[in-house]
């Protein structure tokens, strides 16, 4: 999506100038993985307008393969506005109804392309856009399962995009049940299962079929669960958060990077925490996705602090 942000802090209605950047959960993760040195592709649909062209140009420049992105001449590219009313109070306003991305269908999927991947990363945002987007997500998941591609699901709950909360819950529970790795935050786990302990959430998701569950705690780190092990991995303190949007996507990129490289789960989650923390230090959704050197420097600093 194209993301518009007022150049000043305060109510958006008082803004006179805006900056435009590129954002969106799945494309943020793609950029994050590319900056960490991985081959990654993004499947979507954009309008054949200037915003759509800007998105493709930006992602290509970041090394993301956009060869399976379709351009739609009959629908606009989705946009959203990000308002920072005050420090640590960021609000977003979506304009995605009828967008090009909302017109994705299973026919837009390339089975061979998905089959060649190691992981398929999906979120709960795409199925919120339209009924055909829901069909497309489940079709992509079915392709992945047929070819042994592991599915990583980040609920990324955005109730503003859903017509009914019950429908959102129903769809996301089905997605979780058909995924190998599930990455909810505390609010998302509570939405899906009610207010319980982190251990209860982990147990429920494992019971639905996931082999790895990671419960994100924001600045406080994360818990991860497998059928054999549960561990808490602390986060990285950030003195001043510039922009929290995109931190969860950074976490997903960091975790996927660790899994792709065969790191121990504790190390993979630590990398995820580090990437998520670094993202918050820069304004913009994907702009703050760090490069490998930055991530390793932060992790090494933690190790040095522990050994002192």
Task: Describe each region flagged by the PLM.
Residues 39-124, 296-308:
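Conserved N-terminal subdomain of the carbohydrate kinase-like
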Residues 33, 185, 248:
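Short, conserved phosphate/pyrophosphate- and ester-handling motifs at nucleotide-, phospho-/glycolipid
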Residues 1-11:
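Positively charged, low-complexity intrinsically disordered leader regions
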